[in-house]
Amino acid sequence: MAAKEVKFGDSARARMVEGINILADAVKVTLGPKGRNVVLERSFGGPTVTKDGVSVAKEIELKDKFANMGAQMVKEVASKTSDIAGDGTTTATVLAQSIVREGMKFVAAGMNPMDLKRGIDKAVVATIAELQAFSKPCTTTKEIAQVGSISANSDSDIGEIIANAMEKVGKEGVITVEDGKSLANELDVVEGMQFDRGYLSPYFINNGDKQQALLENPFVLLFDKKISNIRDLLPILEQVAKAGRPLLIIAEDVDGEALATLVVNNIRGILKTVAVKAPGFGDRRKAMLEDIAILTGGTVIAEETGLTLEKAVLKDLGQAKRIEVAKENTTIIDGAGEAAAIEARVKQIRIQIEEATSDYDKEKLQERVAKLAGGVAVIKVGAATEVEMKEKKARVEDALHATRAAVEEGIVAGGGVALIRARAAVGKLKGDNHDQDAGIKIVLRAMEQPLREIVANAGDEPSVVVDKVQRGKGNYGYNASTGEYGDMVEMGVLDPTKVTRTALQNAASVAGLMLTTECMVAELAEDKPAGGMPDMGGMGGMGGMGGMGM
């Protein structure tokens, strides 16, 4: 086991703060409509240019192990915020840096770190309650477009295309992002269904770039039991092979000999097949298989309907124009089912929704309606170069997450204004002791920081702007894009409530851990020997070769 270096108290925290500052300073230059670009080196190919905070954070690894631990903890703030809300990564990083920086001053002054953390937690709870009170539902296409534009770094084209996609497939529909073939962004809407089951073996993958199995014009076999014996499957496999088309098998499970045979046939190119487990459990699984059957124009092969696998024929199989199977989900695009049958099924499910008593059942039934009636929208991102394409695609994906978050929890005034307004409620809070009061003050100070950073990146004076915004009321704030003051909602500067809430929660959580850190342990760097020939110490004693009687 390698030797370890251990650091305690202030010296440990100082190194950790050093790492936090390096990462946060690199990330926060991207904040706001006038945020700057960061260029990331790639081990092969050209560099990547980005304004996405989490992409910058993920690239940073520091040589000093103690500083790196601090950087990695803040990286976790950005990643977690991105995973949950899809945006707000830079805001979360700025908040975490501010809470740690202010908190460390109080810890150095001898305050109790645990009480500081309790004060921070109290302030965060009060702020979130206030944000939810300010929040208003995001319902119109215009509002969705505004949220998308801001998340995509003030790119109104991206905001509009996402709003159009949501309008066409519904807020519950599936929206995917792909590389386009032209310079302009395009929107394709295809009827389709997605469910959360992926391929049963990675050997089914035929598209290495996307790590997906893509089937063009396939048949769909639906079976409600487990398939282990290949003999049951052979008759239908032979019929599909003769037809010369790929096959998707959806069953309770496919394993053993049956799965092995399908994989071998796929690898050899005899028959392109993919096997996936049926979605859901119990009665819900049966209902979802029936949904897929109606969508694809097939029949579920089940004993209840008097059908068996060995007697199945091609007309029992469903069909689709295209099916994409990833590790964790399957998307059926353009199923061959009759529109009237699909409509009747949707009506039937809507009646069940009205009759359902539990919220869980209602939610699951609504999901099924969305999958049958929603469809799939594909946003094709256009760009002049590959570097621009990657950067733009990342922004579209961020904006898509942000708009979903806005629809889910509503919107608040953007540009850091919501946090400034929430300070009034937090300022009235009182802790159980002086140290907890200091923790509340730490969060109060941090809540100004996103606005300060947006203003600094726009080239204006942060203190002047913060003072003017604080003296205003309601949605009054500073639009860094135009340099004007006014009602942020009317100017279209909006943030999803979920993004602001998640950023603050994650920042406070990790910052609280850092403030209460007293010891850090890291591996000692090994001293590598200098270059050159290795030591040949074992070659001595060869001087007596003269007496060898040559």
Curated annotation (Swiss-Prot):
Keyword check for tRNA processing: no
Top-level taxon of the source organism: Bacteria
Pfam families reported in the protein's UniProt record: Cpn60_TCP1
Residues noted as binding ATP in the record, renumbered to the chain: T30, L31, G32, P33, K51, D87, G88, T89, T90, T91, G415, D495
PROSITE patterns assigned: CHAPERONINS_CPN60
Example GO molecular function: ATP-dependent protein folding chaperone
Enzyme class: isomerase
Compartments, record wording: Cytoplasm
UniProt-listed GO biological process terms: protein refolding
This enzyme's EC code(s): 5.6.1.7
Predominant location category: cytoplasm
Transmembrane segments: none
Keywords, ordered alphabetically: ATP-binding, Chaperone, Cytoplasm, Isomerase, Nucleotide-binding
The keyword rRNA-binding belongs to this UniProt entry's keyword annotation: no
GO terms for cellular component: cytoplasm
Record-linked HAMAP family: CH60
Assembly and oligomerization: Forms a cylinder of 14 subunits composed of two heptameric rings stacked back-to-back. Interacts with the co-chaperonin GroES.
Similarity comment: Belongs to the chaperonin (HSP60) family.
Function text: Together with its co-chaperonin GroES, plays an essential role in assisting protein folding. The GroEL-GroES system forms a nano-cage that allows encapsulation of the non-native substrate proteins and provides a physical environment optimized to promote and accelerate protein folding.
Entry protein name: Chaperonin GroEL
Native organism: Dechloromonas aromatica (strain RCB)
Gene expressing this chain: groEL
